[in-house]
Amino acid sequence: MKLILHIGMGKTGTSSIQSALRTNTAALAEQKVHYLGMWFDMIDPAYHGHSGLLDFLALDEAEMQSTAISFFNLMSEKAEANGADTFILSNEGIFGHVHRIKPFLEELRNHVDLSLVAYIRNPYKWLPSAFTQWGLFHKEQKGPLQTFRVRAATLIGQYAAAPVWIETYGDSLTVRLHDTSIDVVEDFCATCGITLPPPQDAGIGAF
């Protein structure tokens, strides 16, 4: 059984990838692929949403290992029910938490063929959009709004996770360069070895 974990990073077309996977359940099923969504709420409904993800990532090492076994058992049940042999979970919020999620992934590797997919993007291309999204509309930090200069320094810090992912999971990790010249959904599908029908709207892009 295989698990493909799409880990981001942010502002690299994640929403487009998730939308394509979510709306093509039948096409995926024909390839024995099942999309689990973006949260770990299959394990516990409390892990749904952004706050739930943080609760999940706050588990200690022993809890993470136990949760990984539960996750594997739940995937096994789904595989038996629907015939899937490959599962996909996509959440860009995982990218910056490589150390916290390590016990979970290390235990999972004992039970499944784990494949990680990450997209990396030139920060010049995404910082203004990220500041608007995470600094204003979906404000992550407590207290007053921060200036672009202050918030950008924090946002750019997520790149520090990239070498850790590569060093820790190099044999299981595929890193793709994201830019506007690619169709990120097509690229993701090719990377994962799956095919999806073309979108109804030509508007599925990479933003």
Language-model segment annotations:
Residues I94-H97:
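Short acidic, S/G/P-rich loop/turn micro-motifs used as interaction or catalytic elements
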Residues A27, H99-Q200:
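PAPS-dependent sulfotransferase catalytic domain
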Residues L89:
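Active-site-proximal cofactor/substrate-binding loop regions of enzyme domains
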Residues Y35-F40, S115-I120, P199-F207:
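A generic structural motif
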Residues M9, E92, H178-D179:
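Structured loops at beta-to-helix junctions and adjacent beta-edge loops in soluble globular domains
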Residues N82, K142, A202-I204:
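Feature targets compositionally biased, intrinsically disordered low-complexity regions
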Residues M1-A84, D187-F207:
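PAPS-dependent sulfotransferase catalytic core
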